[in-house]
Swiss-Prot record:
The lineage of its organism: Eukaryota, Metazoa, Ecdysozoa, Arthropoda, Hexapoda. It is a single-pass type I membrane protein. It is found in: Membrane. This is Transmembrane emp24 domain-containing protein bai. Residues 1-20 form the signal peptide. Its main location: membrane. The gene is bai. PROSITE patterns: GOLD. Residues 21-172 are lumenal.
């Protein structure tokens, strides 16, 4: 049983969204990392910035409407967390600031983020509920399974919405094409009749 759980947790470890990234931020620039997050989901992160005297890096987390969820100035090393209110694309930006008189150099930024189930402390839950290690593992596996089911349900819903949008767009394009053809035929008919009357008036045709 323990071996089976180990294999399952290993698989989940490869597919579950724990993101770790490291990059270099050039002076007086900003770099943003964007991700789609479900509604009412906790997001936690840890960051660390290489120290360069005289240079400052700020970070800010916000949604697509510009609402600030978390921010801090002059960061070096720390943690942050915020709760998503609605399904949206959220972004975390790191902003470099270097005084005009100083020649800036790139700074290394590392970021690790967790969301949803991975933000829970199952060790604390086990101690509070007096659960055995195996029961804690089963609880974690149950939460992971439920979260994956919700993710797939959301993906299916978005796929259906996109399909409906495509079908509506195709219907509108077809209607517009038919309408355009009718307008062109009407214009061509009017031109023929107008030219016929014009030539008759000029007695060029009978």
């Amino acid at each position: 049983m323990l071996k089976v759980l180990y294999v399952i947790f290993t698989i989940f470890g490869y597919i579950w969204p724990i993101y770790s990234v490291m990059f270099h931020l050039t002076p007086n620039t900003q770099k943003c990392l964007k991700e789609d997050i479900q509604a009412n989901q906790l997001v936690m992160g840890e960051y660390e910035v290489s120290d360069v005297p005289g240079q400052i890096i700020d970070y800010i987390a916000r949604d697509t409407k510009g609402h600030i969820l978390s921010q801090k100035e002059h960061i070096t090393k720390g943690k942050f967390s915020f709760m998503s209110e609605v399904y949206d694309a959220y972004e975390i930006c790191f902003i470099s600031k270097v005084p005009p008189h100083q020649r800036g150099i790139s700074q290394e930024v590392s970021l690790v983020t967790k969301k949803g189930v991975e933000t829970k402390s199952y060790e604390g839950i086990g101690e509070a509920s007096k659960l055995k290690p195996l029961e804690v593992d089963l609880k974690r596996l149950e939460d992971l399974s439920d979260s994956i089911v919700r993710d797939f349900a959301l993906m299916r819903k978005r796929e259906e919405e996109m399909r409906d949008t495509n079908e509506k767009t195709n219907s509108r394009v077809l209607f517009f094409s038919i309408f355009s053809m009718c307008c062109l035929l009407g214009l061509a008919t009017w031109q023929v009749l107008y030219l016929r009357r014009y030539f008759k008036a000029k007695k060029l045709i009978e």
